[in-house]
A protein has these predicted regions:
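Mixed-charge, glycine-rich, non-catalytic linkers/tails in nucleic-acid processing enzymes
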Residues: 50-68, 74-79, 102-170
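Conserved RNase H-like, two-metal-ion catalytic cores of nucleic-acid enzymes
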Residues: 1-82
Length: 170
């Protein structure tokens, strides 16, 4: 895990891999991750951002979707639930998504209302609640572990190539 808020930097090999369509990146709802990372790379590391485009595509200023696969698509193909928490309920899956996640995301990722009690800030930073920050990091790590557990469970049931082709078009 790289803590950008604490001043840590993403290793160059990770930055390069993000834009390399020959390296498959996995996430649950990977289009969300791909679009967010596209914007972040464009702003912070434009030298590592590689946009794709095809004729008639009005949203081609993102990382190429061919470098991404999605566990939510895999789950849908298998007829499973379409939430990470829902799939985490699959029998035998050791790692489970943390229920505190929504509150932590709201605290650290959504602007807050400036009040007298919070010193007029509009953004909660790690130093405003170190315990919540530690839990937030653990929550993010756990999501990765749940994602990896899902892939291990589903590995015997691969998604056909035509489904990935449709996913990349979408």
């Amino acid at each position: 895990m790289v803590d950008l808020a604490a001043g840590e930097e993403i290793p160059v090999e990770i930055l390069s891999a993000l834009a390399d369509e020959n390296i498959t990146k996995w996430a649950f709802n990977s289009n969300f991750e791909r679009v967010c990372l596209s914007e972040w790379l464009r702003r912070n590391y434009p030298e590592y951002f590689d946009s794709y485009s095809v004729d008639g595509d009005t949203v081609g200023n993102y990382l190429n979707p061919r470098g991404w696969k999605c566990s939510m698509i895999w789950s849908a193909f298998m007829g499973l639930r379409l939430s990470l928490a829902g799939i985490g309920a699959v029998p035998g899956l050791e790692e489970q998504k943390l229920k505190e996640g929504k509150d932590l995301i709201r605290y650290f990722c959504v602007p807050c209302k400036a009040t007298k009690s919070n010193g007029g800030r509009t953004r909660n930073l790690p130093e405003h609640d170190e315990d919540k920050c530690k839990l937030f990091k653990f929550y993010n790590q756990r999501d990765v572990e749940v994602e990896q557990s899902i892939q291990k469970k589903l590995v015997k049931y691969p998604v056909p190539d035509f489904v990935w082709e449709e996913f990349w078009l979408d």
